[in-house]
């Protein structure tokens, strides 16, 4: 059976762990030559080894994203390792600060926006021209379910993901006519790949009452990324796929029960 990303090349940022790692592994399993990138060299090489051991092709590039120079350097080194072209770009790198609005200082604000938004913007700027010259490509951004639901924590992080989802639509309009499909994935509450199944995940509380009722697995996000990167998604542009167990778009069971409960006065 033909693999869906056979003979394609891909760069996945923030792919030394968690969702990014599973996306890189998923791409490798579907035939893509993958560049794994991140700050932890040991973990990055372990992801490369995992892909190669399964018969795939992968290389690692160290990248500490946040500035324009780092984005451009990563794009250049990745393209060199991939034979001069990057068919698929996944903007996954991101950081989540443990601060509230009242406790966030300027350095933290700038760092989070630099990694979560600025790096994606300038990496896309660096990669898109070669994609256009090659006849097209696919760019996949990682948003988040909390970009569209107000929570008392994570205001800074959620605002960056809202920006990324807005960029997705803008880039689809800008680059779609030039052959580049731009879409995003909005993950819900996702278990870390190495989480002890006998220990309750703190984020599970946010899934109570949602249709899925429990956190998802990173493999669900990887499957969505493979789909968006493949020719199967040729008619999908400017979309944000909610892979969140129904958390954002469906009333919780408690809310639904309140809505459907008969009026006592009737």
What are these regions (language model features)?
Residues 9, 16-18, 40:
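Conserved glycine-rich cofactor-binding loop
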Residues 100-101, 105-113, 195, 206:
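Substrate-binding pocket helix/loop in short-chain dehydrogenase/reductase
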Residues 121, 215-243, 248:
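C-terminal substrate-recognition "lid" of short-chain dehydrogenase/reductases
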Residues 124, 160, 168:
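Active-site helix of classical SDR
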Residues 129, 173-177, 234:
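Alpha-helical segment proximal to the catalytic Tyr-Lys
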Residues 144:
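Residue(s) in the substrate-gating loop at a strand-loop-helix junction
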Residues 149, 237-266:
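Short C-terminal tail/terminal secondary-structure segment
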């Amino acid at each position: 059976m033909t693999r869906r990303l056979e003979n394609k090349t891909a760069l996945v940022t923030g792919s030394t762990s968690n969702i990014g790692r599973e996306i890189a592994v998923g791409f490798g399993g579907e035939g893509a030559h993958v560049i794994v990138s991140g700050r932890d060299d040991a973990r990055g090489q372990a992801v490369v080894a995992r892909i190669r051991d399964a018969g795939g092709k992968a290389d690692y590039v160290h990248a500490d994203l946040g500035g324009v120079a780092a984005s451009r350097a990563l794009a250049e080194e990745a393209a060199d390792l991939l034979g001069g072209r990057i068919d698929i770009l996944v903007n996954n790198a991101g950081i989540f600060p443990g601060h509230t609005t009242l406790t966030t200082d300027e350095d933290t604000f700038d760092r989070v926006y630099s990694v979560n938004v600025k790096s994606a913007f300038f990496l896309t700027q660096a990669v898109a021209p070669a994609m256009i010259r090659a006849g097209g490509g696919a760019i996949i951004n990682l948003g988040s379910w909390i970009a569209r639901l107000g929570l008392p924590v994570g205001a800074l992080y959620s605002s960056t993901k809202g920006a990324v989802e807005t960029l997705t639509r803008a880039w689809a309009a800008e680059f779609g006519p030039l052959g580049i499909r731009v879409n995003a994935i909005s993950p819900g509450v996702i278990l870390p790949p190495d989480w002890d199944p006998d220990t309750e995940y703190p984020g599970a509380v946010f899934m109570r009452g949602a249709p899925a009722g429990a956190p998802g697995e990173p493999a669900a996000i990887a499957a969505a990324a493979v789909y968006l990167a493949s020719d199967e998604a040729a008619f999908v542009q400017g979309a944000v796929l909610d892979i969140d167990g129904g958390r954002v778009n469906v009333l919780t069971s408690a809310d639904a029960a309140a809505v459907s409960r008969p009026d006592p006065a009737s």
